[in-house]
Amino acid sequence: MKPLFATCARGFEELLKTELTELGAQDVRIAQGGVHFGADDETQYKTLLWSRLASRILLPIAQSKIYSDLDLYSTVVSQAWLEHFDERTHFFVDFNGTNREIRHSQFGAMRVKDGIVDYFERHGKARPNVDKENPDVRIHAYLNRDDLILSLDLSGEALHMRGYREDSGQAPLRETLAAALVLRSGWQKGTPLVDPMCGSGTLLIEAAQMEAQIAPQLHRSHWGFDFWKGHNQAVWEKVKAEAVALAEAQMEKNPLRNGEKGTVLCNPPYGERLGTTPALIALYSVFGQRLKQQFGGWNVSVFSSEQGLLDCLRMRSFRQFKAKNGPLDCVQKNYRISDRSSVQTDERAAENPAVSADSAHTDVATDFANRLQKNIKKIEKWAQQQGLDAYRLYDADLPDYNLAVDRYGDHIVVQEYAAPKNIDENKTRQRLLDAVTATLAVTGVETSKLILKVRRKQKGSNQYEKLANKGEYFYVTEYGAKLWVNLTDYLDTGLFLDHRLTRKMLGEMAKDKDFLNLFAYTGSATVHAALGGAKSTTTVDMSNTYLNWAEQNLILNDVDGKRHKLIQADCLQWLMRCDKQFDLIFVDPPTFSNSKRMEDSWDVQRDHIKLMKNLKRILRPNGTIVFSNNKRGFKMDFDGLAQLGLNALEISAKTLPLDFERNKQIHNCWLLTRKV
């Protein structure tokens, strides 16, 4: 009876213990990341051939305390390596772990290698060669703090490499993990197992091998024990022959019977796998509905890293298991679908042939779906009359659904507002997922054209922080102007929809005037002014990215560039240096900014009078300043304006379009002129 250690993914130790016991292992004890057990030669080979869960089977040959690299070397060089393999054998060292002295696993592996080759030289043998790609023998060294365990790896290649597939696909599921998922799913041999998202079929292949009693390593041609002197070829041939005979006997059986209820087991896409979030929300929602419609009386087991996506199934699990899929923390949830689920669905379909799984989308977030449908009916007709294809459909109308829904052509953007800290995070997440599901159903938009964003309170220029790098631009129309938008790369899209009427007004005011657009963003107001017949335009922003965007907006509208200047600068500093006069000035500064690129911090409430003073200096006698900002509760300093000789007329209500009429504080807007 020799001591062995079977490694496995964390969380599968109990399953592995049961499996090894069934294979005849003795003195089976769980450890972190594996299982200790004792075995004779026959059981040793059985565990190698038959274990579906073990990653490797190791034969420990030495244990020692390691306080320095010399201790490590001395331990290795003192082992009787010639009892295990000869000098013609190519070997490789796997070293895992560190301590205070052995700080890098690569250094540890090098010292183990040095000890082995020096041992052979001391015994008058040639130095064995190291082969990283195809070694004959693998040495496994594990260092935990100061405790070293040296082992021979009897497996060779890791045991998850079954050899039945060459292409792992886009989102591979390791075979040992797949086997564990099958065992934990509740599936019973002899009953159907369905994987509706099978990918390369790993789950089904592992289950089929269990059903047919095919040893998972039956087709492996190279083992870690092939060149090991302790290898018992006769016993190995016996164990392998028994496995072949069992598999052949099972091939003649057909244990599955039509009409039986069984188990649905799948590993659907999730965030780090394939697809985008809205598509996944739709997938899980429809999947849950289909399961309840078509699989009454079945068991269901779903493996995912996203709890929120599992919630979209809208089913209550009776058991769950945690597991790792590579670096991802995942969970496997088991469900039972009652027979009445499919019966009730069939009855609904009989009463109303129009009932389908797609209509079930609106069974979630019904209040939200009804409000969105009502808004669409009202707003889309108006938008068509106005010549708009970018507008807001929903803006936190209902307190339980704190989000905005915007249409940009044939795309939909769902923006979640940050919830108050006292609201349960899980509840907020579920409401968002339900709202996305309902939005897909109500709007009919393709899942690939629904973009989901999470908004947080922005400080300074953080609202311009890049989120992605897809570079996907398309244009929308607004009162005859064409404007580029990007729905994915930034938190904002390049177009503030609430300022639509302000831009239209600027276009109507700009004819034959010199126009200044300060804090210009992507220059959409400049486009309207240019199309409105402005004599010249000057567009100033601190961001080169947005100035380039503004330039592309002008080009898109065939605006002659000679009379239209684009200037990259700190707007406040540029304003102090500017000596040109303007007839019409549009200024829409941030509420607050402390950008490192600005010389001073900015607060619109604190600093707006100073801004007006500098603007008045470059404003022609009959000129107009259009001043806007987004600070809720902003109070104009009329006394300060009076001292500057300026009049202010608030026009906020006139600049609020129909699709923003419920949010009267989204911006405030003012006309400022010189006092006569």
From Swiss-Prot:
The reaction(s) this protein catalyses: guanosine(2445) in 23S rRNA + S-adenosyl-L-methionine = N(2)-methylguanosine(2445) in 23S rRNA + S-adenosyl-L-homocysteine + H(+); guanosine(2069) in 23S rRNA + S-adenosyl-L-methionine = N(2)-methylguanosine(2069) in 23S rRNA + S-adenosyl-L-homocysteine + H(+)
Gene Ontology molecular function terms on file: 23S rRNA (guanine(2445)-N(2))-methyltransferase activity; RNA binding; rRNA (guanine-N7-)-methyltransferase activity
Cellular component GO terms held in the UniProt record: cytoplasm
Assigned keywords, A-Z: Cytoplasm, Methyltransferase, RNA-binding, rRNA processing, S-adenosyl-L-methionine, Transferase
InterPro entries (UniProt xref): 23SrRNA_methyltr_KL (IPR017244), DNA_methylase_N6_adenine_CS (IPR002052), RlmKL-like_Mtase (IPR000241), RlmKL-like_Mtase_CS (IPR053943), RlmL_1st (IPR054170), SAM-dep_methyl-trfase (IPR019614), SAM-dependent_MTases_sf (IPR029063), THUMP_dom (IPR004114)
Subcellular location: Cytoplasm
Main location: cytoplasm
This enzyme's EC code(s): 2.1.1.173, 2.1.1.264
Top EC category: transferase
Chain ranges of the THUMP domain: 43-154
SMART domains in the cross-refs: THUMP
Entry similarity comment: Belongs to the methyltransferase superfamily. RlmKL family.
PANTHER family per record: RIBOSOMAL RNA LARGE SUBUNIT METHYLTRANSFERASE K/L (PTHR47313), RIBOSOMAL RNA LARGE SUBUNIT METHYLTRANSFERASE K_L (PTHR47313:SF1)
Main function: Specifically methylates the guanine in position 2445 (m2G2445) and the guanine in position 2069 (m7G2069) of 23S rRNA.
Name of the protein in its database record: Ribosomal RNA large subunit methyltransferase K/L
Organism in which the protein naturally occurs: Actinobacillus succinogenes (strain ATCC 55618 / DSM 22257 / CCUG 43843 / 130Z)
